[in-house]
Swiss-Prot record:
One of its GO terms (cellular component) is membrane. This is Probable cytochrome P450 508B1. Belongs to the cytochrome P450 family. Heme binds at C431. It comes from the Eukaryota. The keyword Transmembrane helix applies. The chain crosses the membrane at residues 1-19. CDD domains: CYP1_2-like. The keyword Oxidoreductase applies.
Length: 484
């Protein structure tokens, strides 16, 4: 009897799912691959969705639809359409889809990644906090961390041992986030495989992989409420890493509550406490916003540093040209300053080319359409509650905007702007920390090249590790040869 009930329920779900997917919804509905009941097109994504969706772009065009289970999903990789959606029609696309994984990751209704009206107040606070932070204080913080990174690398250069950048890049960006959010220093004398760094790196990596991959429970409507409860109480692989990082941040919150001087905020957490602590219901917003900034500010920038080292050892002629430009800019100085940026156009172009060829967040965070809308001069219909994915990798490989897109060619960004270059997103939900991230990238990239010739040790590197919210290369090593 029970078996028959489940069988009938299963058949009903398949039939209703098929009807929903195959029903024509609008005369200008988007094209896309044929979906199957329940799964939709999930089975076609494979283990490397960033490659799959770029291939689909070549078949179905710059905007197309997929069915992620029951979730109607729009994939866009055209800069004109992206700006029309997220700038001209910001109000319709400003919220996130209410999927269990992202709802859990956003702490329900809290933080910068939430999907309600409160995110605008939270985002404005964070933006104002970043503006109020002394430029000199930020620069001194960055300068100190760059110095420590170069010092660590010199130890490998002196001994001649091959150098692996991954953990050092994460320590560099984590140290900056520690100082900016918690006013806390990480000692560079600390063993990189132990202490605070090791305590956080592994769970943070797991979080980004889990958020990027998505699970079947996110996309089957009838399963979503049950899957959310599973994430909260049973899924140790997902809940465990979040719990580790949240406990870490909560401990800092308690320390700040006991030591805060409300008239002289030390860091971002003090500013958040000043803004939200009058309402106890908003304490989770303080914690979740700190978590969002901590995660976003670390992994994406660390990944870009890793990609930079990989691409430079692959292209010694480009590396040498950039070094000569940097050397001309700094003269006898032993370090590069942010004020040198206008004098290093080729290095600036290298940074853009790395972010184009290897976008660290291949899809960013998804958006949601609040209402039915037609875009592209009436050509493309997007239904209410669609999930919107910006295919940043597909955008960077769009031959309409980038000639020979598979080629690493920084010169494409010299003496001209390209409207298709948008690695930090556009509109009101673009990366809130893009200025800080850009400064981190410039100072780390330039000072690495000023000090070291990055040499290939002869071992081929396969491009990507396991797919996640951010993408990094598999671990690799380089030889560091002194430039002095």
């Amino acid at each position: 009897m029970l078996f028959n009930i489940f069988l009938y329920l299963f058949i009903f779900c398949i039939v209703s799912s098929g009807i929903k997917k195959y029903k024509k919804i609008h005369k200008n509905e988007l094209s896309g691959p044929f979906p199957i009941p329940l799964l939709g097109n999930l089975h076609q994504l494979g283990k490397e969705p960033h490659y799959t969706l770029t291939k689909m772009h070549n078949v179905y065009g710059e905007i197309f639809r997929l069915h992620f289970g029951d979730v109607y999903t729009v994939v866009v990789s055209d800069p004109i359409l992206i700006r029309e959606m997220f700038v001209d029609n910001h109000e319709n696309f400003k919220y996130r889809p209410l999927l269990p994984t992202f709802k859990f990751g956003a702490g329900g209704d809290h933080g910068l990644s939430l999907s309600n009206e409160r995110w605008e107040r939270t985002r404005e606070l964070v933006q104002n906090a970043m503006k109020r932070t002394s430029i000199k204080k930020i620069y001194d913080m960055l300068d100190s961390q760059v110095y420590e990174l170069i010092k660590s690398m010199k130890q490998y250069q002196v001994t001649g041992n091959p150098f692996e950048i991954h953990l050092y890049a994460q320590r560099f960006t984590l140290s900056i986030m520690f100082k900016y959010i918690f006013n806390e220093d990480i000692s560079y004398d600390e063993d990189i495989t132990k202490g605070k760094i090791a305590e956080l790196v592994q769970p943070m990596d797991q979080i980004f992989k889990s958020l990027g991959s998505g699970k079947l429970g996110d996309f089957i409507s009838i399963a979503q409420p049950f899957y959310y409860q599973w994430l909260k109480f049973s899924d140790k692989q997902f809940n465990g890493p979040f719990s580790t990082v949240k406990k870490f941040i909560y401990k800092r919150y308690l320390e700040h509550i006991n030591t805060i001087d409300h008239d002289n905020p030390r860091d971002l957490m003090d500013l958040l406490i000043n803004e939200f602590s009058n309402d106890k219901n908003l304490i989770p917003t303080i914690l979740q916003t700190s978590l969002d900034m901590f995660l976003a500010g670390n992994d994406t920038t660390a990944a870009s540093i890793i990609w930079f080292v990989l691409r430079m050892q692959e292209h010694p002629e480009i590396q040498l040209k950039a070094y000569n430009e940097i050397k001309d800019a700094v003269g006898d100085r032993d370090r590069v300053l942010l004020s040198d940026r206008p004098k290093t156009p080729y290095l600036n172009a290298i940074i853009k080319e790395i972010l184009r060829l290897n976008p660290v967040g291949p899809f960013g965070l998804p958006h949601r359409s609040s209402n039915d809308i037609v875009i592209g001069n009436g050509k493309y219909f997007i239904p209410k509650d669609s999930q919107i994915l910006v295919n940043y990798r597909g955008l960077g490989f769009n031959e309409k905007y980038f000639e020979n897109p598979s080629q690493f060619d920084p010169s494409r960004f010299l003496n001209k702007n390209n409207d298709a270059y948008m690695p930090f997103g556009v509109g009101d939900r673009k990366c809130v920390g893009l200025q800080l991230a850009g400064d981190e990238q410039y100072l780390s990239f330039s000072n690495i090249l000023l000090n070291f010739n990055l040499k290939n040790i002869g071992t081929p590197v396969s491009d990507y590790e396991e797919f996640g919210l951010t993408l990094k290369p598999n671990k690799f090593k380089v030889l560091l040869e002194s430039r002095k």
